[in-house]
Amino acid sequence: PSASPAPGTAAPSTGGASASAAALRIGICQIVSHPSLDAIRQGFKDGMKAAGYAEGQAVTYDEQNPQGDQATLTSIAGTFKSQELDLVLAITTPAAQAMAQAITDRPIVFAGVTDPVSTKLVASWDAPGGNLTGTSDFPPIEAQLALVKRVAPAAKTVGMIYSSSEANASVQVDLAKAAAAKAGLTLVTKGIVNSSEVQQAAEALAADAFFVSNDNTVVSAIESVIQVAEQRKVPVIASDPDSLKRGATAAYAVDQYRMGYNAAKIAVRILAKGQKPAAIPVEK
């Protein structure tokens, strides 16, 4: 008889057998529901399937979503810690931070994290150094702000709403200020705590255009920004293609699905090849 995989490793599925004790168990934590993050999750699962890990056969998933609630997120991290999981996928910075705080003895692959170094998830981009690595959605903010001027050449000010409690969001505000200045724009900002404040924040910003970064709280309520923008007849520049379907004027975007797919490739390197997250560079 063939040997069973070692703990934390598994051979790809080649047949139609039902899930067995040899199947990998992966916990997935997605901070909130919106199309871009859904695309990351689907990309990951498709990437695993393409590598031979069919869901329900060679891998099973425990998928959790706290819908932005920090207490629920902490609880999910504790649950994952107590389970016999082979790997955790953390989608976005808050999810990765919660998982990293709770889980130190198993690999964590993140996706949709803007700057894992400044948020102290990894020691460096090239040598993470701990039990985390993954794929980053570090945004092309200069190109995004330049797009504002292309769409609205007469614009002088651009409004940006951000989650004041999320480290990634603060990083993006600083980058956006510099990029706006380079594009000949003045950035005006408004911080929020949750998605219910997005419309009020948009109404409070006197701006010739709105820029929505890949701030998950704001993106989850982008319709509120679009409503205010339409009333004022000003454009909304987004950072993800799905926001175009929801009414944004234009977008300069990172491919979220591909980010999840590539995170699966990293997971396979860890689970099938025995590589350590500490030595796998974070992918931009």
Feature locations, PLM:
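Short hydrophobic alpha-helices and adjacent helix-cap/hinge residues
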Residues: 6-15, 19-284
